[in-house]
Amino acid sequence: MKIRSQVGMVLNLDKCIGCHTCSVTCKNVWTSREGVEYAWFNNVETKPGQGFPTDWENQEKYKGGWIRKINGKLQPRMGNRAMLLGKIFANPHLPGIDDYYQPFDFDYQNLHTAPEGSKSQPIARPRSLITGERMAKIEKGPNWEDDLGGEFDKLAKDKNFDNIQKAMYSQFENTFMMYLPRLCEHCLNPACVATCPSGAIYKREEDGIVLIDQDKCRGWRMCITGCPYKKIYFNWKSGKSEKCIFCYPRIEAGQPTVCSETCVGRIRYLGVLLYDADAIERAASTENEKDLYQRQLDVFLDPNDPKVIEQAIKDGIPLSVIEAAQQSPVYKMAMEWKLALPLHPEYRTLPMVWYVPPLSPIQSAADAGELGSNGILPDVESLRIPVQYLANLLTAGDTKPVLRALKRMLAMRHYKRAETVDGKVDTRALEEVGLTEAQAQEMYRYLAIANYEDRFVVPSSHRELAREAFPEKNGCGFTFGDGCHGSDTKFNLFNSRRIDAIDVTSKTEPHP
């Protein structure tokens, strides 16, 4: 057993209001520069819908993630090394700019410079930020399907409608929607790392964050196809790939990510999970896709177990990280209460950004008397949001974990309602779903109140154990995301070990 630690995230979809504050703040901090205008490290999608980029969940089209071969071994869906090499100069599974959107701005200056006395009112026409040319029509945007925008025929192409009678959901009275914030999953078994020909993508041991070394990246873009969540973007200005860095400078300082800090609905939780690195391959190679969720739970370790603590210390896990893991809200929601579920575990990447399924539309229908009662709790199998849809999204089609999570949240609400409104303690609903009163009270504190100190338990990192920080702090100045350019000479005042980046954006003079 080799114990490693990972900073994970849980998003409570029951409370997401679709305000896109997380997307805007992330955009302003990380991708508000030339080359990545179309890139959104964090975006909020409306489900059902094809998402961003279009139809990203269709792995038959994009070939992302892993597949299990007949001999039980894993292989990138793109193919083995020889197949990857054959596609390196012409990747047929790479999403194009039209699958995202053509980034644009408007000619606002035309409003100021238009001649006076014109017969028509001046307008600001759209202009492409890539080509600089005017666009006749805006065909798509970063959030084109927001709040069920568009006709149902396009929304029905959502892969999560598999095994569902989706025709009935085209009728207005049966319409449903939910918000799905997405970011890099920082997987335990990342397919992007395996598909990078340059070896530029790596997973940090101390916190599990997956990063792209901008000095090693050569812009092959195989990682974009390899990532099943399509959360790696190509910077056309620098010629390198970029992705969500989980705000690692803030994580190292013990602070939450920007998207978590600015979340209006308090839906994001950050915490440490201890896991057995030796069990990753066995878990990801599970034959039945529906068992992948449980196999990933088996990889996680109990931070309160004395044997786990002893082994973690031997493996170099700092005591502050172990203490943070014992207070982790992510561990409570994923392991203790089993409310949080992974996004598309069938991709076999073992994602580390998990989701609590939405309950609000269900509870509203129950209050209105539209659902029959099954004992104390409403019949959650007759929901407005189909359970099978949530299962296709979160548990590879297995409805049992989804039903358990929904029933436990309903039971907690029933218990607290009886306590606060009726002034009595009614534990029948809790007994039905296997919860204690102490667990229900703690769930209420974390889910409903969601104080800052409960949502974010992030220990400051011990980077001093990894390498000398002085050369790294002083040897690299300001950068605009295209790598750290050092001196042209061999002499380096700061004794930094960084390799100078290759300038792929320099323009050469044309031959006469």
Model region roles, listed by residue range:
Residues 1-512:
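Non-ligating segments of multi-cofactor redox enzymes
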